Amino acid sequence: MKRRLVKRRWLGLIGLVVILTGCTRAPLGDINQEDLFSRVERGEALEASFEPYINQAYQPEALAELLGEEVLTGEWFMNNNDDQVGYTLLSGYKEKNSTQAIQLFAYGESEPEPTTVRVTISQLESGDDVSEGEVITEVTIDNVEVADTFDLTTVTIPELEGVYLYRLESLTPTGEVTDRVLSVFYNVLPKLDLAFEVEHDTGTEATWVLHNHGQTSVTFGVDYALEKYDDGVWREVPLDLAFIEIAVQLAAGERYDNDFSVEDLARGEYRLVKTIQAPDYGESFTLQAPFLIK
């Protein structure tokens, strides 16, 4: 028996689409029917001026463009898989007063020259234009040699709620910056606001849409379950589909569209059921998108 591959359209992604291997029927597992909603909202909105920085929290080069700075010259830190020094980013949601390790590691076969490394955390201040405010943490370590993965230093996440800029820099003996990595983290959860719906029913094909109205990115696959309302009970409809295994990261303020076939469905009330992960919240949410076949 042939299995149809799900068609997909990509809209508003922030650049991370991880292609895995093979196909799967991807069962969603046990679903708590009482927890199914078409829209989920959590948290309070941060200042709108922070949104571009939150969206690019894991993207050093995009942050550099926002700040008008130069990053990842390849002089010392890994860039485009050059054999240099690897690093971990301090990005996304971090709990207040938690301790975070700043790690470095040798990448490839090169032996980077020992250098001075500076770690800086400063608060971003909102306004018409976001600006870099007070320096909260600054640590300088001389003569850093990198071999295996090791903890360069540890930092404590500030208690004051806000959005913060993290800098990891290599320096010359005179203090000139030769290479720089930037990221953004925040110790208050950005607003989560997701809506799931079915639209554009042509009689043979419809489109499910995930709207990210919030301020934090979410991740999901293209798999879903289809259910039909029958005698007061939602019953799963078997799907003759092979879902391609991919992970999609959807930025705040964007939407994702995916077409699916409805030509073989009898008249009645249906819903799509789909699970979305919200990494900043450390939770998964199962959403429903009702629709009618007339």
Predicted segments with their positions:
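Surface-exposed, secretory/extracytoplasmic low-complexity segments enriched in Ser/Thr/Asn/Gly/Pro
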Residues: 233, 270-271
